[in-house]
Amino acid sequence: MTTLTITRPDDWHIHLRDGAQLKDTVRDISRYMGRAIVMPNLVPPAIDTETALAYYDRIKAQVPAGSQFEPLMVLYLTDKTSPEEIRKAKASGKIVAAKLYPAGATTNSDSGVTDLKNIYPALEAMQEVGMLFLVHGEVTDSSIDIFDRERVFIENILSKIVADFPKLKIVLEHITTKDAVDFVTQASDNVAATITAHHLLYNRNHMLAGGIRPHFYCLPILKRNTHQQALLGAAASGNKKFFLGTDSAPHAKDRKEAACGCAGSYTAHAAIELYAEAFESVNALDKLEAFASFNGPDFYNLPRNSDTITLVKKSWDVPVSYPLGDNNVVPIRAGEQIDWQVE
């Protein structure tokens, strides 16, 4: 039987939600992830240090006994985020980054930034204190085609931020295009990117050909297969700028299977298992450990995990749904099989 032992991985981008859903999302992510960057787009969002730290406490209260899982918190940037708030967040020791959501770009982003110039003072402070800048890299102009919004963001916005703040560490999150791969590859060592398992395994044909499959609908949206291949190439290249970020984003079944369904795919039930499939598909299992366990903490200037997990090449049946608070969530690969499992 094929086995693969790797240093315990981390998830550098996840949505854990809040309230009754928290016990279920934390249960899934804490099975074998050491740490996770927890997104702050709650209702209301975590726009200040106190709110983010209270959320940290709620997450920790749900970590199962015996798990060493540690949430890493993120501040939600708004037009009014002050340099003082950035310094306060950094001094907390629990908040490691601040997140740009262009207003209206994704789930619960209505409180986001309307004009980048409004956050330049905050970015200056982040550059000074060494706080990372996480970016949802899509424009929100309705005249821009949804499949082009990442590319246009990089060309018109991100390139300027990188030039204006050369010492600011920036993570372009959940990249979906060859354009993003090329930009990150060519940028300075202060620019990195996360890649999801579902963007490595799927493209827009999986979502749209032969019927609409709403559980593949996420933002940024799945792109054509040429972009998928570029992502696989980047992830499997060994380039230290690319690392694991699931963007696992649960929504109740009835909110996905609807006339106007929510964006987000749930992969926390089998994150590293799905990444193993993706890396195996390009004969690069030997590159999985760096992508999943080394590149992220190295970029964040955090220690790598010291223990290991073991993956076994053994198929298992994915349930059609998992509990999610008072509802259920339909995961990626629901009712089908995954080729790998964690021992």
From Swiss-Prot:
Keyword Hydrolase among UniProt keywords: yes
Keyword Metal-binding among record annotations: yes
GO molecular-function terms, A-Z: dihydroorotase activity; zinc ion binding
UniProt cross-references to Gene3D superfamilies, sorted A to Z: Metal-dependent hydrolases
Residues annotated for substrate binding in this entry: 15-17, 41, 136, 219, 251, 263
EC number, as in UniProt: 3.5.2.3
Binding-site residues, Zn(2+) 2: 99, 136, 174
Cofactor note text: Binds 2 Zn(2+) ions per subunit.
Alphabetized PROSITE patterns for the sequence: DIHYDROOROTASE_1, DIHYDROOROTASE_2
Annotated pathway: Pyrimidine metabolism; UMP biosynthesis via de novo pathway; (S)-dihydroorotate from bicarbonate: step 3/3
PANTHER family: DIHYDROOROTASE
Subunit organization: Homodimer.
Entry function: Catalyzes the reversible cyclization of carbamoyl aspartate to dihydroorotate.
Family statement: Belongs to the metallo-dependent hydrolases superfamily. DHOase family. Class II DHOase subfamily.
NCBIfam families, per the entry: pyrC_dimer
HAMAP family membership: PyrC_classII
Protein name in the entry: Dihydroorotase
Source organism per UniProt: Shewanella sp. (strain MR-4)
